[in-house]
């Protein structure tokens, strides 16, 4: 390309044949390409090393940004789980309200209404069939919600063969009465267990005596353990997993509260001998108080060792 005034070339052009065959052009471009490739490889190694150090050591500005990004991801995941839990709770509340309304309607029925099925057996059989289908759907949904609840609380059996605390909930050991003083996070573990039992009662549509966790129970661990135990035994009895009059000392001595909670989540049946009275709060509280006080006395005599 030449200038229209001075007729001097303003841009140097090469044809394709000369570019591909001229030693001067090929050598220069190949050297430049080789140098660029080496620089790209070196920069890629630097970026990879910097990211690995930032992720592993979490030092420097980039490490802090990576750590913050991970925290934001976990926070978003927890927020999604919390939103899902609130939706499930609202759904269960609506089902409970509908159940209570149907129960009140059944109680308000007059004796004359009971004669209607005999007058129209076909309609009665149809209603019975619909009721059976509805009960099956409610039972299936309830079981599904309970399984999701177990996954949300991450209730697992430990693989470390720990004889004292073989189970964990939300990544901390599940406390028990027998080794209460050996666990430094017993209060936090019990709080998670109480929350789980309350949500489980709503998912399984079971009325429990203590439906809320009071703040004063955080200082009175004997009452807190007793409340949790009564609620847990109530669910097991209502779900036909435990007889109505179990012997409380034999039951807790055999399974303890962590074993009973694991059987509730895993679906196993609870074996126990028959007691003289139902597991009331008074009976459970007396056993828990005696067991924990005996543990305190054993600790004072030096028979127990507190693990830091």
Curated annotation (Swiss-Prot):
Q: Which UniProt keywords apply?
A: Autophagy, Coiled coil, Membrane, Protein transport, Transport, Vacuole
**Membrane is among the record's keywords:** yes
Matching InterPro entries: Autophagy-related_protein_14
Q: Does the keyword RNA-binding apply?
A: no
Bilayer topology term? Peripheral membrane protein
Q: Where is this region: Cysteine repeats?
A: 3-18
Biological processes annotated in GO: macroautophagy; protein transport
Localization per record: Preautophagosomal structure membrane; Vacuole membrane
Top-level taxon in the UniProt lineage: Eukaryota
Coiled-coil segments on the chain, per record: 73-109
Instruction: Provide the Gene Ontology terms for cellular component.
Output: phagophore assembly site membrane; vacuolar membrane
The UniProt similarity line reads: Belongs to the ATG14 family.
Q: What does this protein do?
A: Required for cytoplasm to vacuole transport (Cvt) and autophagy as a part of the autophagy-specific VPS34 PI3-kinase complex I. This complex is essential to recruit the ATG8-phosphatidylinositol conjugate and the ATG12-ATG5 conjugate to the pre-autophagosomal structure. ATG14 mediates the specific binding of the VPS34 PI3-kinase complex I to the preautophagosomal structure (PAS).
Record's comment describing the protein's domains = Coiled-Coils at the N-terminal half are essential for autophagy.
Name the record gives this protein: Autophagy-related protein 14
Source taxonomy: Eukaryota, Fungi, Dikarya, Ascomycota, Saccharomycotina
Encoding gene per record: ATG14
């Amino acid at each position: 390309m030449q200038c229209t005034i001075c007729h001097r070339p303003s841009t140097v052009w090469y044809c394709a044949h000369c570019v591909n065959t001229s030693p001067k052009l090929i050598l220069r471009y190949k050297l430049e390409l080789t140098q660029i490739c080496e620089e790209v490889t070196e920069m890629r190694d630097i970026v990879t090393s910097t990211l690995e150090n930032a992720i592993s050591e979490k030092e420097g500005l980039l490490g802090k940004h990576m750590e913050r990004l991970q925290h934001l991801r976990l926070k978003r995941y927890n927020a999604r789980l919390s939103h899902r839990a609130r939706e499930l709770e609202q759904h269960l509340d609506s089902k409970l309200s509908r159940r209570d309304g149907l129960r009140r309607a059944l109680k308000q029925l007059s004796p004359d209404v009971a004669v209607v099925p005999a007058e129209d057996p076909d309609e009665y059989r149809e209603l019975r069939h619909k009721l059976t289908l509805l009960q099956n759907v409610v039972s299936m949904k309830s079981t599904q919600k309970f399984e999701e609840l177990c996954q949300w609380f991450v209730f697992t059996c430990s693989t470390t063969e720990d004889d004292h605390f073989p189970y964990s909930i939300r990544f901390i050991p599940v406390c028990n009465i027998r080794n209460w003083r050996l666990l430094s996070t017993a209060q936090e573990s019990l709080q998670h267990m109480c929350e789980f039992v309350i949500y489980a009662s709503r998912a399984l549509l079971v009325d429990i005596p203590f439906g809320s966790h009071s703040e004063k129970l955080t200082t009175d661990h004997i009452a807190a353990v007793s409340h949790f135990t009564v609620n847990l035994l109530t669910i097991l009895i209502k779900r036909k997993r435990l007889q109505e009059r179990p012997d409380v000392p034999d039951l807790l001595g055999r399974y303890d509260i962590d074993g009973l909670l694991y059987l509730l989540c895993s679906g196993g049946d609870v074996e126990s001998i028959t007691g003289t009275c139902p597991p009331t709060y008074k009976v459970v509280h007396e056993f828990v108080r005696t067991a924990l006080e005996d543990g305190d006395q054993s600790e004072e005599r030096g028979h127990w060792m507190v693990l830091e």
